[in-house]
């Protein structure tokens, strides 16, 4: 049977952990009951002494460590949320005669350090710890351990400010670790290449019709592998690569300035990985045509004849579609170079959205000869001499005379003079 006092006490329960402990213990506080007879609760095992806590017989570093959950509960009791044994009697009567003592004694707490640190991570990738402790004895070990854990991180150790404590072999040390996130490695390689822009006056065009791209000589051998139209400019942009060395990654772009068309804007990308070429190799590519034309401004007639004969010979060697002999095939290295240039031209990093047209030389119309070139020509008839001699050599002398007269007239001989000479010779012989 429950007494009346117990029923009155149950009405004053607040439904917290203290009411559960009070109900299990069955202790009802009254003004006559001294508080020291109730709390603290008897422990199931004796409290070890501080000297026993430092003993580590089996080499286990977790023997002398406390439970972090118990430490959290102890901090709650220290905050004043629960009343303790040392409260005044006025507070006891105001709380309907009940006493909520301290749950855990301070003898169980060795220090405020814990193996489980409380970490606060900020947006600046700095890891802060919130428990107050300062022991700079093992700061060097912190740097070595953190550097081995994160080789890309930046580690800063602050031994002057109180930080969270980590227990290693019975000693404590504090640290502040700052880990920087690695840089974004997904950027394009072309972005990291250094570019150099040079503005020079555009040289005069060699022919009367000025084109948008006149490349000056810069003592390097360049080869053009493409061009691209520019928005807002009537002149295209040319793309060149170094042809002095096969593995050279040097590139340049040549275009007219949008503000001043008389200026050329040359953008150099990457550096040459080879020495300066000799003068003969430097004339390769776009420079060779300009120097050759300037060195021989007035060609003579024999050179023109040689050019005509060479052009005729080249026309004779053109392989028509109807011919049975296949044309000579290109080498595999030349094909690979052309494919590499096309792929590189497609990967050019530029803001324009126009399509890049690869550079290809145009074929002239005279090189394509039709098959019916000799169709309008007629075959020659029989020989004219056979026609003249077809009258026959037999018959009277009159026919022979007319035939001989026809032959003499054909070769421009006079028949009368010949006959007169023959008569004179006969008379002299007689």
UniProtKB/Swiss-Prot annotation:
Residues 340-354 have a biased composition (Acidic residues). GO terms for cellular component: nucleus. Residues 283-366 are annotated as: Disordered. It is found in: Nucleus. GO terms for molecular function: DNA-binding transcription factor activity; sequence-specific DNA binding. Residues 211-277 bind DNA. Residues 286-306 have a biased composition (Low complexity). Keywords: DNA-binding, Nucleus, Transcription, Transcription regulation. Residues 307-319 have a biased composition (Polar residues). It comes from the Eukaryota. Pfam families: WRKY (PF03106). PANTHER family: WRKY TRANSCRIPTION FACTOR 14-RELATED, WRKY TRANSCRIPTION FACTOR 30-RELATED-RELATED. Belongs to the WRKY group II-e family. Transcription factor. Interacts specifically with the W box (5'-(T)TGAC[CT]-3'), a frequently occurring elicitor-responsive cis-acting element. This is Probable WRKY transcription factor 14. It comes from Arabidopsis thaliana. The gene is WRKY14.
């Amino acid at each position: 049977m429950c007494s009346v006092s117990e029923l009155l006490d149950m009405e004053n329960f607040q439904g917290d952990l203290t009411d559960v402990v009070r109900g299990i213990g069955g202790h009802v506080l009254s003004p006559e009951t001294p508080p020291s007879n109730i709390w603290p609760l008897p422990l199931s095992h004796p409290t070890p002494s501080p000297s026993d806590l430092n003993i580590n017989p089996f080499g286990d570093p977790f023997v002398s460590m406390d439970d972090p959950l118990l430490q959290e509960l102890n901090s709650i009791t220290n905050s004043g949320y629960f009343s303790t044994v040392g409260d005044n009697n006025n507070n006891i009567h105001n709380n309907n005669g009940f006493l909520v003592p301290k749950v855990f004694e301070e003898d169980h707490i060795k220090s405020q350090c814990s193996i489980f640190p409380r970490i606060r991570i900020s947006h600046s990738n700095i890891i802060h710890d919130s428990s107050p402790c300062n022991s700079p004895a093992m700061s060097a070990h912190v740097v070595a351990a953190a550097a081995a854990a994160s080789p890309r991180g930046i580690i800063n150790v602050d031994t002057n400010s109180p930080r969270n404590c980590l227990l290693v072999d019975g000693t404590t040390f504090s640290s502040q670790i700052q880990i920087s996130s690695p840089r974004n490695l997904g950027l394009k390689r072309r972005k990291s290449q250094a570019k150099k822009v040079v503005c020079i006056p555009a040289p005069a065009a060699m022919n009367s019709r000025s084109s948008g791209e006149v490349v000056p000589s810069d003592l390097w051998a360049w080869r053009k592998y493409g061009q691209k139209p520019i928005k807002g400019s009537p002149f295209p942009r040319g793309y060149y690569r170094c042809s002095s060395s096969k593995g050279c990654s040097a590139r340049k772009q040549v275009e007219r300035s949008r503000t001043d068309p008389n200026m050329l804007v040359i953008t150099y990308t990457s550096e040459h990985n080879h020495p300066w070429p000799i003068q003969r190799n430097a004339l390769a590519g776009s420079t060779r045509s300009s120097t050759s034309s300037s060195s021989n401004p007035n060609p003579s007639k024999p050179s023109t004849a040689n050019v005509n004969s060479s052009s005729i010979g080249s026309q004779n060697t053109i392989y028509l579609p109807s011919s049975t002999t296949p044309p000579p095939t290109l080498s595999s290295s030349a094909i690979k170079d052309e494919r590499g240039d096309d792929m590189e031209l497609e990967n050019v990093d530029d803001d324009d959205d126009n399509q890049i047209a690869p550079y290809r030389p145009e074929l002239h119309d005279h090189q394509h000869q039709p098959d019916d070139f000799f169709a309008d020509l007629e075959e020659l008839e029989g020989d004219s001499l056979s026609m003249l001699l077809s009258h026959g050599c037999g018959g009277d002398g009159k026919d022979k005379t007319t035939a001989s007269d026809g032959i003499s007239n054909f070769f421009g001989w006079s028949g009368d003079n010949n006959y007169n000479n023959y008569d004179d010779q006969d008379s002299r012989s007689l």
